[in-house]
């Protein structure tokens, strides 16, 4: 797992051999500061739908605190009608995050 702090968000990359429990602990630690999160799970070779759904609780918490919680997933079948934001590339995720920040500031 790789964690990078950017200007208005934290980017977490989950690699295929990383334990999912470590990621959940990492996310829980971020819930204290409530930074915007972009989590890249496109390198996972497991059932991505199940993995995405496991983040629903976290995404809801972030949304309540007016922060972004975005997953980068390279699976076009995943669409959750904004319950949880899933985008295919990091560039799209960053762009979406900045749009959400603009909306929150208006």
PLM regions and their residue ranges:
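Amphipathic, Lys/Arg-enriched alpha-helical "gate/interface" segment within cytosolic domains
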Residues: 2-106
């Amino acid at each position: 797992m790789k964690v990078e702090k950017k200007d208005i968000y934290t980017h977490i990359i989950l690699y295929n051999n990383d334990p999912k429990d470590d990621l959940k602990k990492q996310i829980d630690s971020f819930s204290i500061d409530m930074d915007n999160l972009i989590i890249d799970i496109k390198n996972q070779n497991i059932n991505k739908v199940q993995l995405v759904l496991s983040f629903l609780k976290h995404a809801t918490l972030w949304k309540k605190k007016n922060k972004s919680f975005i997953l980068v997933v390279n699976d076009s079948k995943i669409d959750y009608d904004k319950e949880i934001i899933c985008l295919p590339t990091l560039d799209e995720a960053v762009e979406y995050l900045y749009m959400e920040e603009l909306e929150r500031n208006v």
